[in-house]
A protein has these predicted regions:
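Active-site-proximal beta-strand/loop segments in catalytic clefts of secreted hydrolases
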Residues: 64-66, 87-89, 103-107, 164-169
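Stable alpha-helical elements in mature extracytoplasmic
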Residues: 4, 8, 19-27, 40, ...
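A non-catalytic alpha/beta surface segment that caps or lines the substrate-entry region
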Residues: 12-95
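Short coil-to-beta-strand
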Residues: 94-104, 157-162
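Acidic/histidine-rich catalytic neighborhood of metal-dependent amide-processing enzymes
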Residues: 110-185
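A short small-residue
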Residues: 26-29, 106-112
Length: 185
């Protein structure tokens, strides 16, 4: 762990209009109710995947799907979908590099009805999308320079980034060990 200086943080590019709550390309599509297993959740998943496919095609996309019963849904299984977006050096097999892992959850609460959860989950997801876009060219540059210098191929040198967007963090009724963290277990 190393604290980041104020000067370093000032170098992070602004998200600008992408974070506008009404029209922002990154944030606005997430500002809807997105309870796990609902159409809103599927819509937000599609937003994430489309962003990475169109804007960051060198990033791999992986789904980790599961189902679980919840106290609010009784015997009905609810689907949960975690998304993993990963950028690794082109010379490594997928999952074989040292990965800086950035994580947020994207689901919103079951109650109250139409809860959005902007600052708890929507904004962190938009920030991670912005971070991925901001660092992508530097990852490309680093990987290109390492390839030109014939570096890499060792555990210490093979570095990448992965972003986990998790589903089912919120409790459906009351936060307990069994009614929470469905996607992060």
């Amino acid at each position: 762990y190393k604290p980041l200086s104020d000067n370093f943080l000032k170098l992070v590019p602004s998200g600008g209009e992408d974070f506008d709550i009404h029209n922002g390309k990154l944030l606005a599509p997430i500002l809807i109710p997105r309870v796990s297993g609902t159409p809103g959740s599927l819509e937000v998943q599609e937003h994430f995947v489309n962003f990475f496919r169109k804007e960051l095609p060198k990033w791999s996309i992986e789904w980790h799907n599961s189902t679980s019963k919840t106290p609010a849904t009784g015997d009905r299984d609810i689907p949960f979908a975690n998304l993993i977006f990963r950028r690794e050096p082109p010379w490594v097999k997928q999952g074989q590099s040292n990965l800086l892992t950035l994580v947020a959850h994207y689901d919103s609460k079951y109650t109250p009805h139409d809860f959005i959860g902007a600052t708890d989950s929507a904004v962190p997801c938009a920030i991670l999308m912005h971070v991925a876009r901001s660092i992508d060219r530097y990852l490309t540059q680093m990987h290109d320079e390492m390839a030109a210098l014939e570096e890499g191929g060792t555990v210490e040198m093979d570095m990448g980034v992965q972003i986990l967007l998790l589903d089912g963090e919120e409790a459906f009724v009351q936060w307990t060990d069994f009614d929470s963290l469905y996607g992060a277990r």
